[in-house]
Structures are given as structure tokens and as C-alpha cells.
Swiss-Prot record:
Matches recorded under PANTHER family: AUSTINOID BIOSYNTHESIS CLUSTERS PROTEIN F-RELATED (PTHR39598:SF1), AUSTINOL SYNTHESIS PROTEIN F-RELATED (PTHR39598)
Entry EC no(s): 1.-.-.-
Keyword Lipid metabolism: no
GN (gene name): dmxR10
Assigned keywords, A-Z: Monooxygenase, Oxidoreductase
Protein's name according to its UniProt entry: Monooxygenase dmxR10
Classification via InterPro entries: Fungal_Meroterpenoid_Isomerase, NTF2-like_dom_sf
Gene3D superfamilies noted in UniProt: 3.10.450.50
Amino acid sequence: MPGPAETQAATLAKFIEGWKTFTPEAWTETWTDDCTQNFLPFTMGVPPRTKPEVLKLLPSLLGVLHNYKLEIYSVLHDASKGKAAIYATSFADTPFGDFKWTNEYAVFLTFSEDGTQVSKLEEMVDTAFYKEFFPKFQKYMIEKGAPANH
């Protein structure tokens, strides 16, 4: 049985605040230790990531995003199922000329049994954006001598 609605709502608010802050620690603060992040659609071929994997990879990505901003359009919370959905777009400047980070998402959260943490994160991303962004990001990281995983 899912945790209390008020507890889940507080966790959801804290998750969104961490996403807006968008440091590795702030963004994953509400995640359980065994939380998985899944990129959707599956056709992107990105395997699920554990919290430690996300914490390792995120600094490379954040290093190229400047003036980051998150705009939330809709939040749906189904406390009886212990789930929430967030529709949002994030914006940032990048070092790739005039190319801007403009990533549209639908994020689906599953809460821990007690509702105090997020145990699963599924991120439906803008595939057209990623097809354009990741080659630029990978090239940039290779030029900097760093690994560029997505």
C-alpha cells in the first residue's frame, strides 16, 4: 500500500525543487539508493541507470549547460498508486554555438512504499532534440578528453 498522499506530495515537491536546482546531489536527493532512471522511448537504446551511475555521469552533462531553467507545465499525482507524472521543458545555453538546450519531458515517478522517496524515474524525452544534441555533446567531450555517455 502506498504511503500517505501528503508524504508523497512533499516528496514530489522536493523532487521538483531538486530538478529546478539541477545539481547532481539536489536532483537525486529524493531517490532511493536502488532507484533506477529509465530513458524513454526504449528505441533510444539507453539502458536503465542506477543512482550511482547517474551521479557519475551528470557532472559531464551539467558542465555544458549554463543558465539552466526548468518550466513545469503540468503535474499529476495519483497517491493511491504511488505515482506522479510531470510535463516540463528545460532550457539552457550550451558551448555549441547558437545551439540551445531545449528538452521537453514527461517524467513518471514511482514513490517508495512509505512515500518519502522516489524509487523509479522514467523520463520520456524529446528524441528529435537528443538526436541533435548528443553528437554535439559527444564531440565536445572527446575534444575535452572526457568520456561522453548518454
